[in-house]
């Protein structure tokens, strides 16, 4: 949950925030914090693309949350491994070092400090704690597919499906009076296929 200012909300690491009905400790967008008043129930990331099937046909593909095929296999945004502490039940959040991964996969190429081990992967840079609270994770659409229309979005990894999309997601709150009623949700969408 992010709750450092007057908004409290639960963040899920599959592209959504708010109350996904998964339990009593999951919060909708509550304002002010601890008032029980909800203003937004749920927010989710939707991304659509036209993909070319192996047969040369163009088909639409939209990735959303809470979607599965008839066998129960996920077809939704899924967390990219490595962006949370595997020994924690929480998402990586700036004000709780126990939620951070041992190293950050997207920082492994840093020549001076590969993986930024023991450091926060902040929007404003390494160990930059500008926001009162900041959540960071990545999702991919690798499990989504078009039923009955095979295609290969990434020729370097044929196990991937979806549109080959990676999304870096951040939620940030500040306690400063001018923005104490605001949460910033940033979605950095990358075509990785």
Positions of the model-derived regions?
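A long-range scaffold signal marking pre-active-site subdomains of enzyme folds
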Residues: 1-193
């Amino acid at each position: 949950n992010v709750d450092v200012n007057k908004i409290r909300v639960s963040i899920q690491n599959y592209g959504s925030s708010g109350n996904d009905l998964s339990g009593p400790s999951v919060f909708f967008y509550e304002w002010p914090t601890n008032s029980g008043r909800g203003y937004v129930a749920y927010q989710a990331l939707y991304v659509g693309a036209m993909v070319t099937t192996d047969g040369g046909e163009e088909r639409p593909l939209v990735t959303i949350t809470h979607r599965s095929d008839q066998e129960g296999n996920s077809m939704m945004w899924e967390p990219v491994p490595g962006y949370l502490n595997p020994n924690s039940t929480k998402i990586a959040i700036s004000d709780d070092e126990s939620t951070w991964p041992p190293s950050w996969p997207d920082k492994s190429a840093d020549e001076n400090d590969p993986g930024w081990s023991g450091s926060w992967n902040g929007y404003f840079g390494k160990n930059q704690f500008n926001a009162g609270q900041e959540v960071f994770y990545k999702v991919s659409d690798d499990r989504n597919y078009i039923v009955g229309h095979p295609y290969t979005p990434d020729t370097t990894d044929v196990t991937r499906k979806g549109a080959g999309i990676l999304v870096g997601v951040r939620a940030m709150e500040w306690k400063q009076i001018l923005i104490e009623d605001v949460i910033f949700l940033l979605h950095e969408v990358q075509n990785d296929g």
